[in-house]
UniProtKB/Swiss-Prot annotation:
Residues 1-164 are annotated as: Membrane-binding. One of its GO terms (molecular function) is structural constituent of virion. It is found in: Virion membrane; Host nucleus. Most abundant protein in virion. When expressed alone can form virus-like particles in transfected cells. Homodimer and homomultimer. Interacts with NEP. Binds ribonucleocapsid by both interacting with genomic RNA and NP protein. May interact with HA and NA. Cannot bind NP without genomic RNA. Residues 165-252 are annotated as: RNP-binding. Belongs to the influenza viruses Matrix protein M1 family. It is a peripheral membrane protein. It comes from Influenza A virus (strain A/Turkey/Minnesota/501/1978 H6N8). The keyword Metal-binding does not apply. GO terms for biological process: viral budding from plasma membrane. One of its GO terms (cellular component) is virion membrane. This is Matrix protein 1.
Length: 252
């Protein structure tokens, strides 16, 4: 896996699924391919994106700044600085300085990532802040190692909370989660249908699923009644995709 592919993988792992994730993936690909060279416009776009947490915006802003060539005197952005200040905790700043000194001795992406993984997310964010504010310099490769270690910490905690939801024994939460997933799947089917010949069929399946979820929410049903709904929908979507020759990539 190339370095930039690895960075894209880690960064996207902390972005919530949805149309915005696909949009961010496209921007990252363009930036890494050297197709997008307007850092100012890119940062303005990032600043106004909904849904993303301040820290995720800060990390993306840091990655864009590292990658897009820019004028020496280009102003640093406040929304990135605020996100990368380690919650204003002086302990995070102390640890960030220690980490920075260690990173100065590293020359490889993997070496930097290994060193960074033993620090907390707050310390890692503060260390990124140091570099972003030009208080310290490391190679781009080492900075990317720091980014990926931070994303791994965030993705780990997201995965833990996701796993808690999936394994929860509370039937009401499981039921609601299945209905939300069914609605999301229906939306994906409608987006993929486009203007193809099978579009009508996909829209029909998606529409039925929506109506069923709406009915379940309106009249209230037994929590176990939604169990088959999401699976049926996913099965229909996969069959439809196979006929269309579409890969199950970004959707998984």
């Amino acid at each position: 896996m190339s370095l930039l592919t690895e960075v894209e993988t880690y960064v996207l792992s902390i972005v919530p699924s949805g149309p915005l994730k696909a949009e961010i993936a496209q921007r990252l690909e363009d930036v890494f391919a050297g197709k997008n060279t307007d850092l100012e416009a890119l940062m303005e776009w990032l600043k106004t994106r909904p849904i993303l947490s301040p820290l995720t915006k800060g990390i993306l802003g840091f990655v864009f700044t590292l990658t897009v060539p820019s004028e020496r005197g280009l102003q640093r952005r406040r929304f990135v600085q605020n996100a990368l200040n380690g919650n204003g905790d002086p302990n995070n700043m102390d640890r960030a300085v220690k980490l920075y000194r260690k990173l100065k001795r590293e020359i490889t992406f993997h070496g930097a990532k290994e060193v960074a993984l033993s620090y907390s997310t707050g310390a890692l964010a503060s260390c990124m802040g140091l570099i972003y504010n030009r208080m310290g310099t490391v190679t781009t490769e080492v900075a990317f190692g720091l980014v990926c270690a931070t994303c791994e910490h965030i993705a780990d905690s997201q995965h833990r909370s996701h796993r808690q939801m999936v394994t929860t024994t509370n039937p009401l939460i499981r039921h609601e989660n299945r209905m939300v997933l069914a609605s999301t799947t229906a939306k994906a089917m409608e987006q993929m249908a486009g203007s193809s010949e099978q579009a009508a069929e996909a829209m029909e399946v998606a529409s039925q699923a929506r109506q069923m979820v709406q009915a379940m929410r309106t009249i209230g049903t037994h929590p176990s009644s939604s169990a088959g709904l999401k699976d049926d929908l996913l099965e229909n979507l996969q069959a439809y995709q196979k006929r269309m020759g579409v890969q199950m990539q970004r959707f998984k």
